Amino acid sequence: MPLDLKNYPLLTNINYPEDLRLLKKEQLPAFCNELRSFLLNTVSQTSGHLASGLGVVELTVALHYIYRTPFDNLIFDVGHQAYPHKILTGRRDKMGSIRNFKGLHPFPWREESEYDVLSVGHSSTSIGAALGMSIAAEKEQQGRKVVAVIGDGAITAGMAFEALNHAGSLHNDMLVVLNDNEMSISENVGALNNHLAKILSGDIYTQLREGSKKVLSNIPPVKELAKRTEEHLKGMISPATIFEEFGFNYIGPMDGHNVIDLVDTLRNMRSHSGPQFLHVMTKKGKGYKQAELDPIKYHAVPKFTPDQDLPKSPPSSATFSQVFGDWLNDMADQDNKLTAITPAMREGSGMVSFSKRHADKYYDVAIAEQHAVTLAAGMAIAGLNPVVAIYSTFLQRAYDQLIHDIAIQNLGVLFAIDRAGIVGADGPTHQGVFDLSFLRCVPNMIVMTPSDEQECRNMLYTGHMLNQPAAVRYPRGTGTGIEINKQMSRLTIGKAKVVKEGKNLAILCFGTFLQQAYSVAEKLNATLVDMRFVKPLDKELLDNLASTHKEFVTIEENSIAGGAGSAVNEYFMSQQIKTSVLNIGIPDRFIEQGTQQEIYTLLELDSAGIEKQIVSYYSHLK
């Protein structure tokens, strides 16, 4: 239900940033209150990312107030915090559709708005892209400014520091804003600090600073004394001198919820040349007590009533993440050499309990997927048994390390790959539909696809007991609901399981689509196989099936291009087995947001769609 804009007298007249710039500066605090209230009430009705957006209301307003967007380029890293930005840039009345099928994209998206200059979703990309845009802006000489807004988590990644290092050496005009919500605003982020931030960013100070550099350049001892004096002044109010060493003019930290001071400081900084760095302190969930107290819980929320706690999910089957977390605890009880690594995805990967029960075996490396994988390599070389818990979409970021540091050395590292397949509302940047394709071509890798919770547990155990690289990939969400046997069984590598005997048509299923495929196999009197292993394939079974079946179907929740079905095709061709194979999976395109079921229906990956594809391909089955 759309919100009544009569309750938002200022916001109702703000459709685009040019409308915002018509407000008097003194009106901005009241406008921020309205924007924050609108954001809270909208997300509570629709679900979505909440706490991050609440924390950057003043910063977003100040940036659009001072910078001439969309002429100036404004980039938000990751994009969880971009809801206020979307509201201010022509999408206010569509916010009820965010993250929904055919609705607004969950993150800034270039195809959606000219104000979204970079499509995002993964972290730490903003500074590198901003530098590229600043280089182009310098060449076009039209006075275009470039701003990157990045959080304290995202800036810890190596890619962000690589970009900072490069930007400082090029000296292009650009502003990096560090949104630091790691802690609440501390005492040193008060009136004095905000005042000093305005002084340090002001024209008079800047002119004196640049002029003194020229005057003192020929007097090295005096120049060094002046530099140390400036560093001491900044050091009194900020520990972040590292950014000065990168070549940035550092300002801050300052209160990220004082919109008046932010406007004054940003106005000063917009007129400066060279790389600028503004450090603002914000509180995630600002203005909504429950979110301030538990920003992780309120990071992404379902529909809820703001004056009540979040609704509890109804009892359901265990999620695959929970299955992994339970296995990890049980395995750690047995194996003192087990270690578990996550790149900042403890909650999502089901590792909260493990991090407490086995704190000495738990390693959160922050947003550093490349490091996570090479860390595991070092552990394996030294005799430990590492498990890397990682989302499919984020494993893409560590592909070189997987090959160079793990596979080439044939190290015993287990990859527990969560969110494999269609993940839903986060859209193209988060769908985990490429891992089978990029894993199965890597020598020494064992790749497993469980069809249910028990098989997942047994595969994790099997992979952990191997002395070579292994991957178990499982989807987001709940499993089949079967009762899980705590006893772990080691599977025979490369052996599939015939689930149902049939005639002529054989359906080879990789993963949890086995449930959908079963009803189809019943209707078509087809043989159904739980393939279990993408690499190595059960070649003996394939040979036997090829001698008794004329037609094949492969089903997987992965890109058809290069996926498990392609592995079957390649094997049949290598053996000169002439048979017909239909590959069913993710088509060769990026998949939009929507619920998992909506996407399955769209791609004809539900039972009805799978049957339709098979009958359409093998027309005699109609």
UniProtKB/Swiss-Prot annotation:
| One GO CC term on file | cytosol
This protein's cofactor list reads: Mg(2+); thiamine diphosphate
State whether keyword Transmembrane helix applies.
Answer: no
Under the heading Pfam families, the entry gives:
DXP_synthase_N, Transket_pyr, Transketolase_C
Query: Taxonomically, which superkingdom?
Result: Bacteria
Its top-level enzyme class, in one word, is: transferase
Q: Which GO terms describe its molecular function?
A: 1-deoxy-D-xylulose-5-phosphate synthase activity; magnesium ion binding; thiamine pyrophosphate binding
Q: Which residues bind Mg(2+)?
A: 152, 181
Checking InterPro entries in the record gives: Dxylulose-5-P_synthase (IPR005477), THDP-binding (IPR029061), Transketo_C/PFOR_II (IPR009014), Transketolase-like_Pyr-bd (IPR005475), Transketolase_BS (IPR020826), Transketolase_C (IPR033248), Transketolase_CS (IPR049557)
Q: Which Gene3D superfamilies match?
A: 3.40.50.920, 3.40.50.970
Q: Which PANTHER family match?
A: 1-D-DEOXYXYLULOSE 5-PHOSPHATE SYNTHASE-RELATED (PTHR43322), 1-DEOXY-D-XYLULOSE-5-PHOSPHATE SYNTHASE, CHLOROPLASTIC (PTHR43322:SF5)
Q: Partners and quaternary state?
A: Homodimer.
Give the family, as the similarity comment puts it: Belongs to the transketolase family. DXPS subfamily.
State the function annotated in the UniProt record. Catalyzes the acyloin condensation reaction between C atoms 2 and 3 of pyruvate and glyceraldehyde 3-phosphate to yield 1-deoxy-D-xylulose-5-phosphate (DXP).
The protein's name is 1-deoxy-D-xylulose-5-phosphate synthase
Ranked from the top, the taxonomy reads: Bacteria, Pseudomonadati, Pseudomonadota, Gammaproteobacteria, Alteromonadales
